[in-house]
């Protein structure tokens, strides 16, 4: 028996200012899939990920998400301004009592959840966004440029976590490494 896909895009087309971003795009994401979208800046990778996340409506085509599928989206530059600390941001989507998941990820990522958002560096903000996504443990992870602003130690942690996860994931990069 064939497995139901977590997410399916069928005939997706999108234009910006009359210019096609993509046309008649089809994509099927199955449980456990690992997909990398690699391309030059401005080629539509982040826009496609927003369509996958359900945050951008295509001009044409269908986005189908299997009912009950948890999707986590790590955007390229999340707005943390509504939060006092990095830990507040990282735990915001978790049910009460599940905050320990952020602490576990924070330990691996070597970031301090009590760090005020106002004084956090780009790398610290990125680590908080990763901790949030990993703490959510969704069935499908959408990661837009997850290694931006990270040092080698954090990148190696991310690689190990992604290598061990059972979640499917789509990762965007403009770096072929």
Which role fits each region the language model picked out?
Residues 1-177:
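ABC ATP-binding cassette signature C-motif
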């Amino acid at each position: 028996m064939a497995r139901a896909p977590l997410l399916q895009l069928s005939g997706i087309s999108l234009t910006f200012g009359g210019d096609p971003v993509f046309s008649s795009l089809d994509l099927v994401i199955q449980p456990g899939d690992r997909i990398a979208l690699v391309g030059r800046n401005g080629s539509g990778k982040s826009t496609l990920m927003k369509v996958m996340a359900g945050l951008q409506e295509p001009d044409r085509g269908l986005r189908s998400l299997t009912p009950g599928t948890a999707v986590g989206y790590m955007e390229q530059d999340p707005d943390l301004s509504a939060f006092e600390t990095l830990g507040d941001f990282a735990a915001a989507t978790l049910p009460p009592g599940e905050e320990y998941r952020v602490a576990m990820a924070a330990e691996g990522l070597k970031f301090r959840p009590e760090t005020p958002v106002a004084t956090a560096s780009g790398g610290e903000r990125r680590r908080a966004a990763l901790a949030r996504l990993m703490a959510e443990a969704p069935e499908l992870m959408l990661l837009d440029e997850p290694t931006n602003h990270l040092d080698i130690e954090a990148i190696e942690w991310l690689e190990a976590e992604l290598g061990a996860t059972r979640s499917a994931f789509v990762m965007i990069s403009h770096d072929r490494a």
